[in-house]
Amino acid sequence: MNKPYTKPDYEQELRRAGVRITRPRRIILNILNETEDHPDALEIFRRAVEEDDSISLSTVYHTMKLLEERGAIHRHAFAGGPSRFEQASGAHHDHIIDMDSGDVVEFHSDKIEKLQEEIARSLGFEIVHHRLELYCKKLKS
């Protein structure tokens, strides 16, 4: 049921849009491209300073804002925590948020997508955009 998707590399696209790709921006883009999780700005900062200790938290915030404005990343404001980020991709997916650990799991289900379309259509609507976030607790063994 889970379908893999690839995260695009936005560096070239940002250059075409006139955005200068500085070392901190490249490091942050690489972090987002290589990560499997949805880090917050502080976690991105921690990972960035491992590569270049001259990067400041302010630089991370400014870069994240720029990347969000350019459509290179998505900001998620999951309940109960700081904004989390992921590199934008063309493939739609939904999220399960583990309420105990805060972990975010991406998934795609054709069955859920079809049901949402059927419901919208039956009520006289066409889905333009949607976001599904399931807040869950792990099953006990």
From Swiss-Prot:
The gene is fur. GO terms for cellular component: cytosol. It comes from the Bacteria. Residues 1-89 are annotated as: DNA-binding. Zn(2+) binds at residues 38, 86, 95, 106. Belongs to the Fur family. Fe cation binds at residues 92, 94, 113, 130. GO terms for molecular function: DNA-binding transcription factor activity; transcription cis-regulatory region binding; zinc ion binding. Keywords: Cytoplasm, DNA-binding, Iron, Metal-binding, Repressor, Transcription, Transcription regulation, Zinc. Acts as a global negative controlling element, employing Fe(2+) as a cofactor to bind the operator of the repressed genes. Its main location: cytoplasm. Residues 90-141 are annotated as: Dimerization. The keyword Repressor applies. It comes from Brucella melitensis biotype 1 (strain ATCC 23456 / CCUG 17765 / NCTC 10094 / 16M). One of its GO terms (biological process) is negative regulation of DNA-templated transcription. It is found in: Cytoplasm. This is Ferric uptake regulation protein. Homodimer. Pfam families: FUR.
